[in-house]
Amino acid sequence: MMNKLYFYCLALFVAPTFSAFGQTQPSQDENGYYLIESAEHLKWFRDQVNASEHEQVDTNGDGQINMDDDTVVRLNAKLTADIDLGGESWTPIGEYNNGEEPDEVRFGGYFDGQGHVIKGLNVQPIDGRQSYGLFGYVAW
C-alpha cells in the first residue's frame, strides 16, 4: 500500500515537469482553431503542419491529383498572446524544397495573429531547403 501511495505522489510531482521540456499541444476553440499562447505551442503547430500527410491538392493546375501535386495542410490557429522565439533557429511552417525530397508541404489553413507579435525569429539556411521565414510555403 505504501509503495502505491509513493508512486502516485511521485507521479503528481514529476508529470508536470515533462511538458516543460517538450512541446505541448495547444487547446482548440469551438471552431477547431489551435490557440497559440507560447513558443512551444507555435513549434508544436509548425511540426504538425510539416509532418502531416493531409490532403493532396491539384497545385499544378492540370485538373488532376497526381504525383506532381503538393500536400496542403489545412490546420487553423490563432495567436492569443505575443510570442518570443528567443532567437533560436526557426524551421518555417510549410516546406518548399524545389521539387526535391522530402515532399513539399503547403500551409493552407488560417493563421490569425489577432494583433499579437512574434519576435525573436531567427531564420537560418537549411541544407536542401528553398523557403525561409515564419511561413515557408503556403497554398493560395
Residue ranges and their predicted role:
Residues F21-W140:
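Surface-exposed repetitive/solenoidal architectures
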Residues Y8-T17:
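Bacterial N-terminal signal peptides
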